[in-house]
Structure formats: C-alpha cells, structure tokens
Regions:
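Structural signal for interior beta-strand "rungs" in well-ordered beta-sheet cores
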Residues: 2-133
Length: 133
C-alpha cells in the first residue's frame, strides 16, 4: 500500500505499493507512479507522466505532461523539466515533446532538461546542468 501524506493532493489511483508521497505534492488523476518510489515534498506530477519503480524525486520538482521516468532513477532537488519547445501563454500544442529518463539515471540538483530528449541508461547528470541535446 502507498503512503500518502494528508497534506498532499493525490488524485491518481495509479500509485504503486510501498510508494511514499510527502506533504504538499500534487499528483494529477492520470499520472502513473510505480512501486517503492519516494516522492518528496512540493512535487507536481501532471497527467501524461509515467514514473517507474524505485524512483526518487526530491523536493521542488515539477514533472510536466510528456515525461517518462524509467526504473531506479534519481531526480535531484529543484530539477526542471520542460515540455513545450515554443511556449506561449494560452496556446496549447496538440501534443508535448516526449522526454525519457532511462533506467538507473541520476539527475543532479537544479538541472534543466529541455523537452524532447532522452537521458541514457545509468547516465549521471551533474548538478546545475542544462540538457539541450
């Protein structure tokens, strides 16, 4: 059974066993989170997001539509994902660029992942990096 802090707004029923979701998180209804994950405080997870098993997402991360995170991934604090390559206020694309974080990857604190890229298996992204290709 998942453990969800009472001060979080978790609307999804797709939360795996032994997953912890801490305070002030928001998880949209169609998000999918695997088993044995740790979703730290102040994390936002949108609808078109898939998170595998044994994933850690540290505080201050927003995971927007179009992001897939495979098993055994570490996402450091305040990592920023983007999902729209040409963002405009009140203009919504037909679909968002897909971003895939492959199994075992580690993304350091305050890194930015520009939409539409894949991070390879067991890759290590240093703190403060900006991934553009």
């Amino acid at each position: 059974m998942a453990r969800i802090h009472p001060l979080s707004a978790v609307m999804s029923q797709n939360i795996g066993n032994e997953t912890n979701i801490w305070q002030f998180c928001v998880v949209f209804p169609q998000a999918r989170i695997g088993d044995n994950c740790n979703i730290c405080a102040n994390v936002l997870i949108e609808n078109d997001v898939i998170i595998g098993n044994n994933v850690t997402v540290k505080s201050g991360v927003q995971i927007w539509d179009g992001v897939e995170i495979e098993d055994n991934v570490f996402i450091g604090p305040n990592v920023t994902f983007t999902n729209d390559l040409v963002p405009r206020s009140k203009v919504y694309p037909q679909s968002f660029a897909r971003t895939i974080i492959k199994k075992g990857a580690s993304i350091g604190a305050n890194s930015t992942i520009i939409a539409g890229h894949s991070i390879g298996e067991y890759a290590f992204i240093g703190a403060g990096s900006v991934i553009t290709k």
